[in-house]
A protein has these predicted regions:
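Receiver (REC) domain active-site loop signature in two-component systems and cognate sites
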Residues: 3
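Conserved phosphate/oxyanion-binding catalytic-loop motifs
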Residues: 35
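Asp-based, Mg2+/Mn2+-dependent phosphohydrolase catalytic module
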Residues: 6-13, 17, 21-27, 38-60, ...
């Protein structure tokens, strides 16, 4: 999303035309963000403001992946969630018993992201883990871009909990395999039918490489063309493009036979 479809609160040129092209061609695609901060509905409304009309089901967050993981592994568990009220409500609405800092015990600590996280949240998370809770992290992004450079993100919060407790988190989000399997099931596709589009080599393109799918890099976000051409980054992606129009033209020429499904992938950025 951010860096691929829009830059914070501004649409990226050709994004709406590219999505319209995919829709007219009958292509299946989803948007995935590593940030658990906003709900699919909030992101759908944001996209609609950029003339991009998609359903909530086409937008997936790392928070949803965390919920799916627990539904598959321990759907009757109690959880302590570090994150926004929206994320806590999502867990509660999915049937989990979400506890606050006053409870005596939790089965899992879910480390998400919120700009209002404070010491008491981290202290409570550590206490639950010392008492036997397992740690899950929605995404390991230690920092994300913002208007003033960088700002800490989920990975930084998680690192403090890991350091204090010695407990290693179960890593979800990109570039993990569980997230890939979740997206693959959502699209009901084989690996050879999938490709990922993103703007960051160390997360988006690595996601494709580790999970064995084609990866297309666009130079509209984090990674510049010069960085992409650096020899150290060779082998991390299949092709690079200046913008989505160039990718669209490439797709028109390439796809005379079976056409791939797309996963639009992006590192989260600070919301303005």
């Amino acid at each position: 999303l951010d860096g691929t479809i829009y830059q914070q609160n501004r649409p990226i040129k050709f994004a709406d035309k590219f999505i319209s092209y995919l829709q007219k061609e009958g292509r299946e695609f989803v948007f995935f963000t590593n940030s658990p901060e906003k709900s699919p509905l909030e992101l759908k409304l944001k996209l609609s403001g950029f003339n991009i009309d998609v359903s909530e089901k086409q937008i997936i967050t790392s928070g949803q992946v965390a919920i799916d993981y627990l539904l598959c592994h321990n759907k009757n568990c109690t959880v302590f969630v570090i994150g926004t009220n929206q994320l806590k409500n999502d867990f509660s609405n999915s049937g989990f018993n979400v506890v606050d800092s006053k409870s005596k015990k939790a089965d899992y600590v879910v480390c998400g992201f919120s700009r209002s996280v404070d010491f008491s949240d981290i202290e409570s998370a550590c206490r639950y883990i010392w008492n036997g809770a397992k740690l899950i992290c929605t995404n390991f992004d230690e920092s994300i871009p913002c208007e003033n450079g960088l700002t800490p993100h989920t990975g930084a919060i998680n690192a403090s909990i890991e350091y204090a407790t010695g407990e290693k988190a179960i890593m979800l989000g990109k570039p993990g395999s569980y997230t890939f399997e979740f997206l693959q099931n959502r699209l009901n596709a084989q690996k050879q039918e999938l490709c990922v589009i993103g703007d960051r080599i160390d997360i988006d393109m690595l996601f494709g490489k580790l999970n064995g799918i084609k990866s297309f890099l666009v130079y509209t976000g984090i990674t510049s063309e010069a960085e992409a051409l650096d020899p150290k980054n060779h082998g991390f992606f299949d092709a690079g493009f200046k913008n989505l129009k160039q990718l669209m033209d490439f797709d028109k020429e390439l796809c005379q036979g079976p056409k791939p499904h797309y996963v639009f992938s992006a590192v989260p950025k600070e919301s303005v």
